[in-house]
Amino acid sequence: MTEQTAQEPRPASEPAADGTAETNGASLRCPNCGAPVEAGDAFCESCRHPLSPQAEAPVPELSDSAAPIEITRSLVVSDGQDEDTVPISRPCPNCGGVVGADGYCEICGMKAPNERDHYTEQPAAWVAACCDKGIRHYRNEDATAIGADLEPGSRAVLVVCDGVSTSSDSDVASLAGARAARDLLVASRPAGLGTPASLTSAMAQAMKQAAATANKAVIANTAPDSENAASCTFSAAVLEGDQIYFGNVGDSRTYWLPDLDSAEPPVQLSVDDSVAQARISMGVPRDEAENGPQAHAITKWLGRDSPDFVPMTGARTVDGPGWLLVCSDGLWNYASEAPALQSLIAELAAADPDPLPLAVSLVKWANEQGGKDNIGVALARH
């Protein structure tokens, strides 16, 4: 999740010193992530944080408008039709047992995270994505959507959208937007006029169409009377042979990270639409700008109240093996500069170089650094 310049960021909940659940009016909340808990719970079902025994009576659950959204909830696509998603069978993260239809493990009884909290994608062996709610938040407002041809290095589409935390239903809207953009870019294969320049121009137009399509999907998933219209970032990349085409709105990013033994330098391809980037452009050091006041406030976004959702686009020719990475700030918060991400990926890939385990390892690493935000990671191997 990210912030919008036009809105105040949601206050972060601070942990109680003794590890007990905090009270907010009549409700109990986890001291670690702020999710609602019940008296007597041994641990938070959202972030697994241990809780001290509570003397208070159980409190009502979250209202429907604030409750975490299952990935099995129907999404409204831009043509007004419903797009149903099917639950994925998964083992219990605690004991490996079977998770029942009620969401609880049939062996140990632990409630499993819902599908929207953590999911992975792998349409081809050389492309993968992982999306996770992190540790500090009780809902995942990041979304990934990817597509690829089966032949390694042929063509891949990576999309990441990061829902704005202060807007309503951004978890649903970001997923709808990411999928809509992915579907358009998978289907759209412009050839231009047979020259590299014309192909780059045609792909730039495709990126703009993808952002517009994603914007329609976000609006379609926004309640007409909502005072805080759903909104999200947009970052997409297409890897086709030795060419990368990319576009972004907001502060989700696209990186090209060649292998360590390559003479080619790692590079952040996209440029953020954010307060931090504006300060960097004025000469403020990156570390200071990205950790200063309103650093993650974005200046462009997708959504009904967006004044400008036309993406910045670009292209790059790559030479040699490496990784195309599209990610939300939940990852780059902890490794912003391209060389740092290049070294991190090299270290994690040494244990398992396959894209899916690597994407999962990047998410795990971000959580180990604090997991203060949702995390969206999409990878393609070149």
Predicted regions and their residues:
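PP2C/PPM-type serine/threonine phosphatase catalytic domain
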Residues: 1-382
